[in-house]
Amino acid sequence: MKYFPLFPTLVFAARVVAFPAYASLAGLSQQELDAIIPTLEAREPGLPPGPLENSSAKLVNDEAHPWKPLRPGDIRGPCPGLNTLASHGYLPRNGVATPVQIINAVQEGLNFDNQAAVFATYAAHLVDGNLITDLLSIGRKTRLTGPDPPPPASVGGLNEHGTFEGDASMTRGDAFFGNNHDFNETLFEQLVDYSNRFGGGKYNLTVAGELRFKRIQDSIATNPNFSFVDFRFFTAYGETTFPANLFVDGRRDDGQLDMDAARSFFQFSRMPDDFFRAPSPRSGTGVEVVIQAHPMQPGRNVGKINSYTVDPTSSDFSTPCLMYEKFVNITVKSLYPNPTVQLRKALNTNLDFFFQGVAAGCTQVFPYGRD
């Protein structure tokens, strides 16, 4: 079975202290777009970076990238990997970056696979980023970004539920309960418990399979709006493999994450002392182990708890190209139904970049025509 390139709930949408602050343009009316776009400082997006020239294990918690505590106004979000990279200076420490900076950071700091990085970064940028200014936020919006575009623009960054971020995260709660982005001690203790029960005190792929199923069942039982279809169906499985693949010291590389290191990444956004990145590029390696532990069909609760209903129209692991097509033709197109001139050009450019990360064998779609 083939599996689509996966990335955890990475990235962003919006503004930065060093630049004029801009929110996502998604959801604005044509009249609002016509008024706002001429006021923005347009940036020509850089080309997606290629793979690392040297992708071996190396010290990444080094003198050039020390951990620093948050300053007032710094942004962090639901993704422990991105939070950690920002706190070590691989990303701008304020939590706002361009797609190029993010792809470089996840490769250099964690040895994340290039194709997966391109796929996830541009997917998030398309739905949560500002395509004119080429800026993305890894978490919440902030007053330091300046005036937002008028409603109904999406201004939530990675914290925005239902565009990129989704339900049943390992250490963050569902958006239904009010906080989908902060570290959740209760959920982390569940991760520790499952690591003790199924991994001999270490988090590994066996633990990932059991914990993924547990979090799905918890959401079915408590969240009447639980949704587990299409994009989230893919990323939910992929993200459970990342701690075993990326948070284990690369000199050991045994897929066994100890709990001190897990807490350091998940809670404190901090690499362990003397930490080496993985010895080769990787992303969702072993995801088939997680999927096969407790196979699920995509679906959702229908307005009440314990009402999980299979959605036969959702893409799944046998139809990765359908996931890509629905993301572009439905999700992106619904956010930008009739873009013109500069915005249309930016959309087409970023859709082209996004397609570079899509699984081989899929056919590119052009919802806005070809430039």
From Swiss-Prot:
Residues 19-43 form a propeptide. Disulfide bonds join 321-362. It catalyses: RH + H2O2 = ROH + H2O. Optimum pH is 4.7 with ABTS as substrate. Optimum pH is 7.2 with benzyl alcohol as substrate, and there is another optimum at pH 6.2. Optimum pH is 7.2 with dimethoxyphenol as substrate. Optimum pH is 6.0 with naphthalene as substrate. Optimum pH is 7.0 with pyridine as substrate. Optimum pH is 7.0 with veratryl alcohol as substrate, and there is another optimum at pH 5.5. This is Aromatic peroxygenase. Pfam families: Peroxidase_2. Residues 1-18 form the signal peptide. The gene is APO1. The keyword Transcription regulation does not apply. It comes from Cyclocybe aegerita.
